[in-house]
Amino acid sequence: AGQKGTGKWSAIAAMDENDPLTLITEAVYARLLSALYPERIKAASLYSGKLKVESGKLSDNAQLSTFNFQLSIEDVRQALYAAKLISYAQGFSLLRHASEHYGWDLDYGTIARIWRKGCIIRSVFLQKITEAYRKDPDLENLLFDDFFHTKIQEALPAWRRVVAEGALSGVALPAM
């Protein structure tokens, strides 16, 4: 998979600012891994061990069906939504730290409004970010806004189920 470089640039900027930008950085890593197809196939054949529960504990060579949480589409939707919220919070945190570092005096509500009208990140969801920063221009992190806090709390149980099922099924979900 090709890259335009914006994710990589964002990840480097986050590291320069000592700011976690985990979801974007993991997306960059996923692209890099995607390009290593022959190595991924070989590794999968060498490390395809399954999990098993014996006496209430995990052991090797188990059947994955032991851990069937019966995830619903709604569980996955909620988990993706929570990850999206975290990604936006991390991105705006990076903007805030860079603005402080470089003396940019950025208006985050306006940035979200501009992006909503047509940029890399067009989304109706950006209106909620605009509203959060209109309410509190000095908002330290989007996760401290009432809307974002409530949405994370609502999504948290499904998010945990999806991540647990992924881990127990041998499916890496680093951006979750």
Language-model regions, residue ranges each:
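NAD(P)-dependent dehydrogenase/reductase Rossmann-like domain
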Residues: 1-52, 58-61, 70-176
